Amino acid sequence: MLQASKQWQWISCAKKNRLLLDLNEDMQLCTPYKLRQLTDSTFKNPYFSLEDAAFYEQVYQYLVQFKLWNPAQLCQISLNATAVKFQLKPVLAKSWFFEQYTGSTPSTEAVINLTSKAQSGEFLIVEHSSDASVCINLSENFQLDDNLSLVQFEAIRVLNNRVHPLLNQHIHSKIA
């Protein structure tokens, strides 16, 4: 696991129109988040905070138990989740893209499935409220409909009745 450092900084890159995380002299993480999506605090306080570090490590440790991703992927997922949690403005719910979950088993995990008309894919819940959840796309590309798609780690808010707890069965079949 890449250990969080007080030297890490969030960078608002106008050239790429993206939020970057400067990890050291040789390494930067380029997120899919555009500058217009960022909170004002991103521009005022660019340092990776203790709160950022704690959340990053919590997500990493949670995801490692699934045994689906290598350490580099775990870092990338965890850092993008941290960016969404602390650096992004609130996103509006876009539940109409997803099928409603009609099963009786509630989701108890933060790694979930969402199903659009075009496909089904894995997402990570970054923030959860009683009505809706902010999720990041874990697939390389997720097709919402014929015209729109989400790139990897792009955030979307969905009503909780769209959350499918199918990954538990999927994970156990991959591990077995």
UniProtKB/Swiss-Prot annotation:
Primary location recorded for the protein, binned into one broad class: cytoplasm
Subcellular location(s) of the protein: Cytoplasm
Domain of life of the native organism: Bacteria
One GO cellular component term: cytoplasm
Keywords: Cell cycle, Cell division, Cytoplasm, Septation
GO biological process, one term: division septum assembly
InterPro entries: ZapC, ZapC_C, ZapC_N
Assembly information from the UniProt record: Interacts directly with FtsZ.
Family: Belongs to the ZapC family.
Protein purpose: Contributes to the efficiency of the cell division process by stabilizing the polymeric form of the cell division protein FtsZ. Acts by promoting interactions between FtsZ protofilaments and suppressing the GTPase activity of FtsZ.
Protein name according to UniProt: Cell division protein ZapC
Organism: Pseudoalteromonas translucida (strain TAC 125)
Gene behind the chain: zapC
